Each structure stands twice: as C-alpha cells, then as structure tokens.
Amino acid sequence: MAAVAALVLHISSTAVEGQSSQAPPKAPTVTAPQDIAAVPLPPPLAGGAPQTANYDIDVTLDPAARTLKGREVITWQNPGEIAAYSIRLHLYWNAFRNTKSTWLQQRHLIGNDPFADADAEDFGYSTVTKLVRINDDGSELDLTQALHYISPDDRNTDDRTLAAADLANAVEPGKSLRLRVEWTGKFPRNFDRTGAIGKYFFVSQWFPKLGVFDQAGWTAHQFFANSEFYSDFGHYDVRMTVPTGWMVGATGVEQSKADNGNGTTTHRYVQGDVHDFAWTTSPDFIERRQAFDQPGRPQVQMRLLLQPEHAHLAERHFAGAAAALKYYGEWYGAYTYPTLTIVDPPYQSESGGMEYPTIFTAGTRWLSPAQSNDPEYVVLHEAGHQFWYGMVANNEVEHGWLDEGINEFSDSRVQSVALQPNYLV
C-alpha cells in the first residue's frame, strides 16, 4: 500500500509539472513535444511485492478437443490479522458453462450475448477433479468432497465461478498453506478475453485461483460481465505443453523449451512479482523483437506475436508500446519487468484489447492509415495497464475506475505529445 500511495502522490506532482522532450526509441510515428519541460526520471520503486500466492503449474493443451488438463501447487501465506478457516477458489471459465451463469445472464440483459445461438460445443467450463491440502510433514488431506460452489453476490445457485472449502485446521496469520489442485478446462468457442478460434488460443483466467484474504477475511466475488479481477502478487513457474511447432507467448521469461518426442513441446515460463499469468499459442504467429532502451533504466525486450497479414504494422505496434514505457516510466516509475509481449489476435477472435502481467492483446483494424492512431492507441493503452493494473494492482472488481481512469487520462496525454494529435487533452 505504501508503494501505491507513493505512485498516487507522484501523479499529483510530476505528471502535472512536465515530461521529457525526447521521443520514444524506435518509434517512427512519434514526434517530440516542444512545450513541455523535461523532468528527472523518478527512481524505481524499492523492493518487490509480498509473494503471497505462489503457483507452480503444469498444463497440457489438446487443441482438437479445445481442452486443458492441469495440475498446480499453490503456496499461500496468510497476510491478514485473523486466521483463515476456509479457502476461496475462482473458476472463471464456468462463466461460459451455460446460459444460467451470472456472467451470461448479465451479457444477455445488455444485449450483447455471444452465446445467444450457441451450440452445445460452444460452451466452456473449469472443473476441479482433485483438491488436496499438503501438510507440513508431507502428509495430505483430501478436500475434494469439501469443495462446493458459492454465490455470495447474487445468490445465483447456477453460477459456478466461485468455490469454497472449509479447513479443519485454520491458517494462522503469517502461516502458510499448500494446496495441490488438479482440474480440466474447456475453451469456449466464442469468447470474451479467453478462448479459441481456429488454431489460435488465448489462455487467461484459466487456472483455479485463490481469492484475496486480508483483515476483513476473504475478498472473492463471482465473475460479472462488467468486472475484471483482483488477486495477490506471487511467483509463477508454469510449464505449458503444446503441439510441436506452435509458438508460445506468456507472462514472464521463457526458461526452457523441451521436445517431448511425442509431437508436443513443453515451454517453461517464470515470473515473480505478478498477480496473474496468461499465455497464448498458435502455429500461425510471426515473431518480431525490439529492445526498449532508456538511460538509467534496465532494458525491456519487447516481443510481438503478429498475424502474418499484419506484418507491415510491426513498427507501429512497437511505437505504441515504446511510448507507454517511456512516458509512464518518467511519470510513475520504471516498468519493472524484463519482457513485454504484445499479441496481435486474429480476425473475429474477440480477444483484443486486454491486459495481463507482462503480456497483452492489441487489435488491428482492417484499415489502419498512417494518419490514424490505430494500432498505436490500443497498444499504448494496454501497455499502460502494465502500470495501472499490473504494478499498481487495485481491486478491479470493486474499484475498476481507478486503473481505467488514470490509464485513460495518461494514454490520452501521451497521444497528445507523442503520436498523431487526434485527441484534445
């Protein structure tokens, strides 16, 4: 919270006073502002976030069946001031389980129902097949039968996006809990933020995920059509097995890639100090890389996974990302991760314009004239969310205005000085 307060105070001073007159590196559409004075770069934030919820995950994709089979070990430390007598697990993909879920009922009410004419195969799900508590002595306690669905927000008993299980032995403040979870998931065919189309898979909110516990107990809501997410920081070590020859992009840094000899390859990605993990895979991506360099800052490797028909727009994607890294870094503090992955989703995938730690989806229009800010704007906006949502991890379910409001103000200000001045700010 101290880090959040420091950044918010920084907005009220540095962001109003001025910004650098240098254009972002390797950004051909960027023009240098002439009327805003340069200010010194703010120092990086000291230390990292508490690693409260840590995930070690193995997952295998079956693209023909559009399914995932996963196994994870969660190591969670109680950061609150009271004991935890139960757990909460988010199972977001159950929002697509049937038309009775709260998420789909809300989408229907607003007239934007992607499953209005869906076939049975179009739906998705997330099913926990095993839940085990690993005790300190290595023994295990099976909690599978204790896991049950809850709907604290709207009492919709058909909604299965949130589950709970009571613990026989409470987790005292400062103590740790280890859980082993096995599950299967199916991608919805038509999707919002996650799912599959053809051989393109974007995999987000895909694993059973703990809620947030504090001095008031659990903060864990059902999945709503107009809400996003909230979770603890932690360390992620994830192994994703996909067909050999398919490219993978994910949160964090790739550590290894192993051919399994059976037509599949396992990609291992690791990242600490993040509060979520998303990934994508497809055999059709083309890859481009560009380094973002700024004096006094660690280098950031920008990686772009692009649809082949959009290859001519690669530099414009990098321009948007570089503008965010430069100006947000000057105003709010440096981007703290070594990588940033930009995903260009295919036509009709409906997965564009969404942010996750160190990775986000952009979006390319059919017409992208040089005089427009597309695709630069959506890249700038989603890269900006790496600061406001990613590093300043507000509760997006209850206070979504915070990251969206500050990020929208900030990206509009960047547009007015670094891209085509099509916005009045």
Could you tell me what each predicted segment is?
Residues 2-12:
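Bacterial N-terminal signal peptides
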Residues 7, 18-69:
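N-terminal, polar/Ser/Thr-rich
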Residues 67-95, 99-100, 111-113:
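Ligand-binding face of N-terminal immunoglobulin V-set domains in extracellular IgSF glycoproteins
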Residues 110-138, 148, 154-168, 178-285:
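Extended, low-hydrophobicity, Ser/Thr/Pro/Gly-biased non-transmembrane segments
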Residues 205, 209-218, 225-380, 409, ...:
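Hydrophobic helix-coil surface modules that form long, contiguous segments used
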Residues 352, 404, 408-425:
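Acidic/His/Gly-enriched intrinsically disordered linker/tail segments
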Residues 379, 383-388, 406, 410:
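Active-site His/Glu-centered metal-binding helix of metallohydrolases
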Residues 383-399:
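Catalytic Zn2+-binding segment of zinc metalloproteases
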